[in-house]
């Protein structure tokens, strides 16, 4: 395989990167972006800096690191990450992460990797998010590659899945880069982090004759990200509520609204746990399984690591006790923390055209389900 086989989905090459930097620097939205990332510098200075970047690494080390710093300073009280000692800076991994926030799950991991001597990863970039040229340019200059969402005919879905599988294997084995991908299509809305069996099946499509080798060669590393205050918790509650009555249809601009809400909403403490990579030894124990059973078993391996590594906060224990009418976890939070959480729950009362008790139960479930999954 050659990189040109993936021109339709890959990130920008060096020449395309230079052209994109010029477009970003001269876009109509640049003054707004500049003011957020570099509030104390003039637009002219920042425009010149962006236009002069020569490599992705320069862009990520300077501007994207600054973006993450601003997010952390403005909306996170404490950011931590652990588990990097399980990996080698020279290794090429497939980071499979739970997915709670459209942008920050992957972006905060890149920030941590960069600050600890690891190269950043390529990142999956949903085609549905490619709403304009500026977003495409920023994404593809950050090593993002396009992933088509399910839809169309079965034949087309198979073709795009096989193409994605080929690309993932090419990046890790031949290009010598790592990749970040979510454990499922779309974000977790209800607090249950579960790996989609179809994702594992897709990984195996590019090595159909040896299911053990297919997974082992990708060097899968499960990742768990935990937010003290769930990203877009009210928006997720409303979406889950609407889904109770009819198939949910996204509204125009909804993804962008979720991205902006996720960036700006107070998140409290945020922790990323990099789990032990999957080993060939544990995969060999699954050798006698059928392909379908194997895909399910590998997904369970990831779920076990991610759920075990997920960091619980007082909000999770409070929600559990409230939802199930117990005091089981009362030693894990204070009365003040409980009152703060209840104040957030009461915000749902503004949506008086909905069944408020149902809304509250959904909201509590988002926070309580990670406790159930331990």
Where are these regions (language model features)?
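Long, low-complexity C-terminal extensions of enzymes
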Residues: 306-374
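A sequence-composition feature that detects small, non-aromatic residues
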Residues: 20, 25, 35, 51, ...
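A cross-taxonomic marker for long C-terminal extensions/tails that follow the last structured domain
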Residues: 244-323
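Soluble catalytic domains of membrane acyltransferases
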Residues: 67, 73-278, 345-349
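Soluble or luminal CAZymes and related metallo-dependent hydrolases
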Residues: 63, 159-164, 294, 298
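Membrane-anchoring hydrophobic helices of lipid-metabolizing enzymes
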Residues: 1-93, 99-110, 114, 136, ...
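General structural signal for secondary-structure boundaries
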Residues: 52, 56, 150, 197-203, ...
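Residue-level preference for long, well-ordered alpha-helices that form the structural scaffold
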Residues: 56, 156-160, 291
């Amino acid at each position: 395989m050659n990189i040109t086989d993936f021109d339709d989905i890959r990130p920008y090459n060096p020449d395309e990167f230079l052209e994109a930097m010029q477009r970003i620097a001269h876009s109509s939205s640049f003054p707004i972006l500049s003011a957020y990332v570099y509030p104390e510098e003039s637009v002219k200075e920042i425009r010149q800096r962006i236009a002069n970047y020569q490599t992705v690494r320069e862009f990520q080390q300077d501007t994207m690191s600054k973006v993450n710093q601003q997010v952390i300073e403005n909306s996170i009280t404490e950011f931590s990450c652990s588990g990097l000692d399980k990996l080698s800076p020279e290794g090429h991994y497939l980071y499979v992460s739970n997915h709670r926030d459209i942008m920050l799950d992957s972006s905060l991991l890149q920030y941590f990797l960069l600050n600890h001597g690891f190269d950043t990863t390529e990142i999956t970039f949903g085609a549905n998010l490619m709403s304009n040229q500026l977003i495409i340019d920023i994404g593809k200059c950050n090593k993002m590659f396009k992933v088509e969402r399910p839809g169309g005919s079965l034949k087309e879905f198979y073709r795009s899945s096989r193409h994605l599988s080929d690309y993932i294997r090419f990046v890790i084995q031949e290009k010598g880069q790592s990749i970040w991908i979510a454990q499922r299509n779309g974000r977790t809305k209800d607090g249950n982090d579960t790996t989609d069996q179809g994702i594992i099946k897709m990984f195996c499509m590019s090595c159909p004759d040896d299911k053990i080798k297919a997974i082992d060669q990708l060097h899968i590393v499960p990742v768990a990200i935990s937010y003290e205050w769930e990203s877009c918790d009210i928006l997720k509650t409303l979406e889950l509520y609407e889904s109770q009555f009819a198939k949910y249809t996204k509204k125009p601009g909804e993804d962008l609204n979720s991205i902006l809400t996720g960036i700006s909403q107070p998140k409290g403490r945020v922790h990323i746990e990099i789990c032990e990579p999957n080993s060939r030894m544990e995969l060999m124990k699954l050798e006698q399984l059928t392909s379908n059973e194997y895909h399910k078993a590998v997904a369970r391996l990831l779920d076990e690591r991610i759920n075990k590594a997920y960091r619980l906060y007082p909000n999770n224990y409070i929600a559990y006790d409230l939802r199930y009418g117990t005091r089981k976890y009362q030693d894990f939070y204070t009365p003040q923390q409980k009152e703060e959480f209840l104040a957030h729950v009461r915000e749902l009362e503004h949506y008086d055209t909905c069944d408020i008790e149902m809304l509250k139960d959904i909201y509590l479930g988002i926070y309580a389900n990670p406790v159930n999954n331990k």
